[in-house]
């Protein structure tokens, strides 16, 4: 028979279902003068929506309960953050940092990476302890987030929809692109907040 009983628990949390929307408009004359106007507008709207999703994901990572304070960015700071996760396998980890911290991180790692051709040529950080370092403006200065993709989940509630409207008198074309979703921290054990100077 069974020797142990496996139990599962969860903490209920309420989340807001949000609409992420991009909007742009152009006039027929603009599209005639430059056929890329529509493509650029659609691309800009899509990027706006992605940036909003990214900002929400960072807000959710901020709720993580595991923390790894560090005096400064260093190889040791990353090692300590990885240790907080207590993982058997470190596959799938990534580290998000701010562009404001990128220079300090490069300087701190210069002795560890000085023989890496990419670092010597471009200042490329790449990976630290096998963890890819991703620089994003969505992360505030002096903070970092070590995580796996399982930490935050995007629950799509409504597929992408596109609406358009055109005023025939002014030849003004309007586009709205939207997606309805919930962005939530779904596994707090898969994320560590790194506080620099704290």
Language model segments and positions:
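Alpha-helical scaffold segments that mediate packing/assembly in large oligomeric complexes
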Residues: 20-91, 193-198
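Sequence/fold signature of self-assembling virion shell proteins
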Residues: 8-14, 108-198
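Assembly/oligomerization interface modules of large self-assembling protein complexes
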Residues: 1-20
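Solvent-exposed loop and beta-edge segments used for protein-protein assembly and interaction
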Residues: 16-18, 89, 169
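Extended, solvent-exposed, turn-rich assembly/linker loops in the middle of proteins
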Residues: 61-131, 136-138
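Short charge-dense sequence patches
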Residues: 1-3, 28-32, 109, 125
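Helix N-cap / beta->alpha transition motif
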Residues: 27-28, 96-101, 147-148, 187
């Amino acid at each position: 028979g069974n020797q142990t009983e496996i139990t599962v628990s969860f903490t209920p949390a309420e989340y807001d279902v949000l609409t992420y929307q991009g909007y742009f408009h152009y006039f027929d004359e603009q599209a005639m003068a430059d056929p890329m106007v529509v493509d650029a507008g659609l691309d800009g709207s899509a990027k706006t929506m992605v940036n909003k999703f990214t900002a929400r994901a960072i807000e959710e990572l901020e709720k993580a309960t595991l923390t790894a304070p560090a005096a400064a960015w260093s190889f040791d700071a990353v090692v300590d953050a990885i240790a907080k996760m207590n993982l058997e396998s470190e596959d799938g980890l990534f580290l998000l940092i701010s562009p404001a911290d990128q220079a300090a991180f490069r300087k701190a790692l210069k002795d560890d990476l000085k023989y890496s051709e990419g670092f010597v040529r471009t200042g490329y950080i790449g990976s630290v302890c096998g963890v890819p370092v991703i620089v994003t403006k969505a992360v505030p200065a002096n903070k970092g987030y070590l995580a796996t993709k399982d930490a935050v989940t995007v629950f799509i509630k409504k597929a992408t929809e596109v609406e358009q409207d055109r005023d025939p008198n002014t030849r003004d074309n309007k586009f709205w692109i939207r997606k309805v979703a919930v962005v939530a921290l779904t596994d707090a054990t898969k994320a560590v907040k790194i506080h620099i100077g704290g």
